[in-house]
């Protein structure tokens, strides 16, 4: 199946957008399904870094480990799920607009199902993400444009 892709323009510089979206501790602030995030290891986020992300889907919570595959500030990042029945694959790209005063953020999300995840991905996960992702991007835009981002 094709990745789910959403794009939004944000009135902040690519560096500001990149800094916020690639800090996994911010996920629960702008992603509706993200309950908590825990870094696995103490080092700064880099290629190879891992984080445990707990998400709520309906009334259930699931934790999966995501690993940073690519991290090219301030333009691109790629993280991939390495365990659990549903493994997300997230790629983000930031394009500068208006001489770098604004940014165009494109998020692309795909999934691999393992075991029960093979049934969950098409029946539950994809429909949920198709609804949530545009809302998440609007929330992110609001946080960044209000200056509330840490």
Task: Locate the predicted segments by residue.
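Generic structural detector for well-ordered beta-strands
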Residues: 7-11, 38, 67, 93, ...
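Short beta-strand segments that buttress and anchor functional surface loops
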Residues: 49-56, 77-83
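A short, structured loop/turn motif at beta-sheet edges
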Residues: 14-15, 42-45, 69-74, 93-104
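Residue-level preference for beta-strand/loop junctions
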Residues: 2, 47-49, 60, 86, ...
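Short, cysteine-centered beta-strand-loop-beta hairpins and adjacent loop/turn segments enriched
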Residues: 57-62, 113-117
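Short, surface-exposed coil-to-beta transition loops
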Residues: 3-5, 61-65, 87-91
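Hydrophobic ligand-binding cavity/cleft-lining segments
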Residues: 1-41, 46, 148-150
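Beta-strand/loop substructures that line and gate deep hydrophobic ligand-binding cavities in soluble
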Residues: 78-135, 142
């Amino acid at each position: 199946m094709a990745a789910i892709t959403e794009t939004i323009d944000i009135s902040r510089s690519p560096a500001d957008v990149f800094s916020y979206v690639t800090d996994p501790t911010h996920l629960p602030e702008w992603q509706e399904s993200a309950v908590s995030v825990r870094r696995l290891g103490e080092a700064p986020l880099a290629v190879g870094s891992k984080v445990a992300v707990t998400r709520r889907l309906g009334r259930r919570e699931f934790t999966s480990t995501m690993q940073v595959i690519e991290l090219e500030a301030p333009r691109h990042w790629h993280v991939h799920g390495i365990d659990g029945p549903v493994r997300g694959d997230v790629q983000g790209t930031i394009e500068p607009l208006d001489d770098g005063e604004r940014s165009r953020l494109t998020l692309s999300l795909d999934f691999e199902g393992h075991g029960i995840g093979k049934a969950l991905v098409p029946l539950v996960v994809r429909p949920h993400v198709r609804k949530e992702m545009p809302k998440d991007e609007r929330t992110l835009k609001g946080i960044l444009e209000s200056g509330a981002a840490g």
